[in-house]
Each structure stands twice: as structure tokens, then as C-alpha cells.
């Protein structure tokens, strides 16, 4: 008998599953007999419990398991026979009004994958960012690298500001050592007192009022000031309250940046200390980073363009599944940050609804585009990307081995290659406008994405 598939909506379907009770009972009996061989009950040796007692104890559980298995098997058979592309998991409910003495009947309600209509790629518009790495970008990177290697000299030993002597006031960029005492309504509070506390003025590590109070002090001088803690301050006992502080400056140290010389080049991994080689390596790294960032921006542009020209309905079941994935990813992120009980954090799935819908929609569009145009990742493409990624590490061969030793990592690289194939394919047909941007603007754009 042909199965009747009812249309309940654009993607929602329903089909009735019928199971002969005698077939189900036969399977129940077989499982109970198998179970009886190992059942333990007080007063009986293992495997010697009467079958009737085993049935009384486990019949309900076994029946539920058999029905679940049989329903799933029958649904799979119907899906194949009717060429149904089921999206997500079906839900099953007994048809109470049609139960017969000889048959179990269940309604299976589910969604199917949609038809994906991708419009004319020639109408898609994409702005492609490009950037050029020159001496200015290399010099800015060297400045950053120097600041990362800053060291400090005690007052009187010289430094970036010049030798102002031991009685010169502290200024932004100086590293200061202080003692401080804080009170609220005349009473000291936890965390409000410290000795030999070290911080760098201008880094923003301390609250603004604290930094302002330390600025301009000389070694041995003190200053009193009021500090109002923000309402959202991490210390709940003092949040929103005003404290009276006394800060005493004990030591001031000048910042000193290393010279760009052979030793500096060696610290960056240039073994012979050659400055020309150092600049060439920095340029190569910046170009690699610029390529990665421009690819990311262009990929997002292409994905947005594909969504604009595509028509499809999105299965709710797939959106809900992806919402749960995003919730788990958020919990894992919290756990990595050291948040206690992160795995049980009450994160509402609804907050990811729009993101999940976009992800699912894009996945369906990309799958259709890849299938229709043969854009699957080739082994040599995957290897080329792995090799390129490995170049930025000290031991590229070890990184390559690391990738190929784990199928999940390799699958992630394969997915990246597929996306790259899609991007290249779309760029070859879309209206593309090239836009030159600075490396700083490029970095800012990808940081905000």
C-alpha cells in the first residue's frame, strides 16, 4: 500500500506509520527471552529467573524500546520509498482515534529540505578590499614590536624622556611603584590597601581617578583623592560607592625602547641579525596577514550577496539544532575563560535565533552552489592551504603532520577550501569593485566583523 504524505505547510509534512501488533509482540518476546539470560533477582541464580517474572518486571520498558526502534526503521523505509529529504528529527505521536486491535498507528511529523533558488550571479555586487604593504606599515610594526619589548630604568639612568633626575614628576608611560590606602566612610575595605603596587601610567589598567592622582607626583610624595567606583564594578561591595584614597609614590621608572639593531633582529628570529632580512620577513608576515584579512572581508561580502539573490524557506528544525550548537559553543567559551559552572550556564537559545537562521540559510545555499558547479575541495587544494598555514610556524612540517593526524582538523580545512572555491566562483561572475584600504583600516574592519 502506498504511503500518503500530507503537506502541512511549505516544508512541514506528516505521514502515518502502521505496525502490526503481532510483529511488535514477537520482537518483545524475543528481547525478553534474551534479557532473561542475564537478569538478577533475589532468590534466583543468574539466568534462572522465570520468564513470566522477567516479563512482569521489564515488559513496559522493552515494549517502549521495540516500538521506538520499529517506528524509526519504518520511517526510514518510507522516507526512502517516497524520496523524502528529511530535515532534522521527526516527532512521533500515536493516532489514538485509529488504533485497531491488530495494528499500532503513529503520526510522524517532520520537515523536508527546501528547494533552493539561486539568482543570477551576474547581478551580485561585491566590494573587494585590497591593501599594499610598504615601508610605513613595516615601521609601524617595528614600533609595536619595540613597545612589546620595553624595559624600564630607574630615575636618573636615562630613558625615552631623557634624564630628568630623581626628582622629576611621574608622567604617562612611566612605571610607578606606589602604596595606597582606601576607605569608605572612614572604614578600610577589602582590596582597598596595597604596598609596592606597580603599574604603568597611561595603560588604562587603573581607574582614571587613580591614574590622575599618581600623575605629577615625585618619589616620596603623597596625594589624597576621592574615587567613585562604577556601578558595574566587579567588586560588588564597593560598586557605585565613593572611596577616599591616599596614594604615596615610592619609585618612578622611565620606559626605554630597544634600539633597532642586530640584537633586536635576532630577538625576532633573524639568526644573523641582518636588518634587511628582518624587514623582509616582517613584510612577508604582514602580507600574509593582509591576505587573510581581505579574504575574510571578501568572503563575508560574497555570502551577503548570495543571500540577497537566493530564495528558500528554512526548516525550523535545522535552526533550532544550530541554536543549540551555538549555546554549547558559548558555554565552551565561558569554560575556557575560567567561568565556574559554565557547562550549566543558563544561556537562552533565542538569543542566537537570527545568527542560526543565517548560518543554516547560508549552508543550504552553499551546498546547492557546490553541488551544481562541482566546487568540492580537491586533496591538492587542502594540502596547499595546510602548507600555507604552516609557513607562519617555526616547524612547518610538524604543523602539517598535526593537521593530517586528525580528521576533524582536516575536515575544518576542507570546509575552508570549499568556501574559498565558492568565493572565487562568485567573484568570477559578480560585479566586483576593488577598493584600496590601509592595513590599519583592514585590521579594524576584521576586528569589528
Swiss-Prot record:
It is found in: Cytoplasm. One of its GO terms (cellular component) is cytoplasm. It catalyses: [protein]-peptidylproline (omega=180) = [protein]-peptidylproline (omega=0). One of its GO terms (molecular function) is ribosome binding. GO terms for biological process: 'de novo' cotranslational protein folding; cell division; chaperone-mediated protein folding; protein transport; protein unfolding. Gene3D superfamilies: 3.10.50.40, Trigger factor ribosome-binding domain, Trigger factor, C-terminal domain. Its main location: cytoplasm. PANTHER family: TRIGGER FACTOR CHAPERONE AND PEPTIDYL-PROLYL CIS/TRANS ISOMERASE, TRIGGER FACTOR-LIKE PROTEIN TIG, CHLOROPLASTIC. Consists of 3 domains; the N-terminus binds the ribosome, the middle domain has PPIase activity, while the C-terminus has intrinsic chaperone activity on its own. Belongs to the FKBP-type PPIase family. Tig subfamily. This is Trigger factor. It comes from Burkholderia pseudomallei (strain K96243).
